[in-house]
């Protein structure tokens, strides 16, 4: 479950290539029990050792974030059938040094004060502003050359409901910073750097994997399979870009009630496959983005809908203003063998009470 601060959506171009300006910011070296890590980007893991696999392993340096951007670009290139992706050649990650970052003056906790929800949007918008101002002052970045600014900060995102009391409530939530947040929380109502007005952007953590940090030894001490709590950053990253290019959220942002659930990127589907294999946007979202065109069908018509082929979306009108969109979703790993069927077979053969973890299915089927 994500805890996001979202208001208006700025429409952007959902086709073509998106030029990203990624900024890495850290915090003063600290030992604050209310936040994860020490304010700096991870160089080595010091948490629970998941021998078989580690999601988003350190060092979290410039090369690591290049990989994150490549991953999210590949995701959008795939789900849009080549209509939209990141412009990898003209996107940049600052600072240019492999292990460098811009160190802010304020602590991590100061940007998400505990028990002060009324100040949350203002504090997080200030983080966005502070990061941009600092990066420009040190490297003179021309932000007009980019379509979207992404601020990667040291530490974990305050984005998931954990099955126990969260010991680090002042971690910073991943956030799409929209025009309204800037207008309401920045002096003068705008963010202008060297004559260029920045209208929106994204705030993301360096990772979503708690198990890379020492605190995980206490957090997951009672978990029988703590490594199953690893999550990748790709799903969160894709969700935030979805907001930035104008894809509407498909859950109730006032109450948090899910709409399409795990079946679409713009709801809980961003966390599918431990956050490393997010669900594609729903058929409606893909049509809305201009990536696909539905085929109108009438009742008593036989149709074939191959899984994951462009424009294989059936549109069935209910009345003048409502319709169903139908597509074929298939989670087969190889022909005629799905993740669900493998999970069932492995559970039956193991004789154990619990279902085989999803990640084990992927390993055993590779």
Regions found by a protein language model. Name each.
Residues 7-9:
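N-terminal signal peptide c-region/cleavage motif recognized by signal peptidases
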């Amino acid at each position: 479950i994500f805890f996001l601060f979202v208001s208006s959506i700025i429409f952007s171009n959902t086709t073509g290539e998106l030029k990203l300006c990624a900024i890495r910011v850290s915090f003063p070296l600290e030992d604050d029990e209310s936040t994860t890590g020490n304010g700096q980007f991870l160089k080595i893991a010091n948490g629970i050792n998941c021998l078989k696999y580690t999601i988003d392993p350190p060092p979290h340096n410039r090369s690591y974030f290049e990989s994150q951007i490549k991953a999210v670009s590949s995701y959008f290139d795939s789900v849009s059938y080549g209509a939209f992706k990141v412009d990898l050649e003209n996107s940049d990650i600052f600072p240019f040094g492999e292990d460098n970052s811009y160190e802010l003056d304020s602590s991590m906790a100061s940007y998400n004060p505990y028990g002060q929800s009324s100040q949350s949007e203002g504090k997080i918008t200030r983080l966005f502003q502070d990061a941009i101002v600092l990066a420009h002052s040190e490297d003179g970045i021309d932000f007009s050359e980019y379509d979207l600014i992404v601020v990667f900060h040291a530490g974990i995102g305050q984005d998931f409901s954990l099955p126990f009391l969260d010991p680090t409530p002042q971690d910073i939530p991943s956030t799409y910073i929209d025009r309204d947040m800037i207008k309401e929380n920045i002096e003068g109502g705008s963010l202008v750097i060297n004559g260029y007005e920045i209208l929106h952007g994204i705030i993301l953590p360096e990772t979503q994997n708690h198990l890379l940090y020492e605190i995980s030894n206490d957090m997951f001490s009672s978990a029988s399979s703590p490594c199953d709590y690893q999550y990748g950053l790709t799903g969160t990253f894709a969700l935030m870009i979805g907001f930035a290019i104008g894809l509407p959220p498909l859950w109730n942002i006032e109450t948090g009630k899910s709409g399409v659930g795990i079946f679409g990127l713009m709801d809980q589907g961003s966390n599918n496959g431990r956050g490393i294999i997010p669900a594609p946007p729903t058929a409606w979202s893909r049509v809305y983005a201009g990536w696909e065109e539905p085929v109108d069908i009438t009742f008593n018509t036989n149709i074939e809908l191959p899984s994951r082929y462009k424009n294989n979306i059936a549109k069935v009108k209910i009345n003048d203003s409502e319709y169903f969109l139908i597509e074929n979703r298939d989670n087969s790993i190889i022909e005629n063998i799905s993740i669900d069927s493998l999970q069932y077979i492995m559970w039956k053969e193991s004789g154990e009470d619990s279902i085989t973890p999803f990640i084990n299915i992927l390993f055993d089927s590779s």
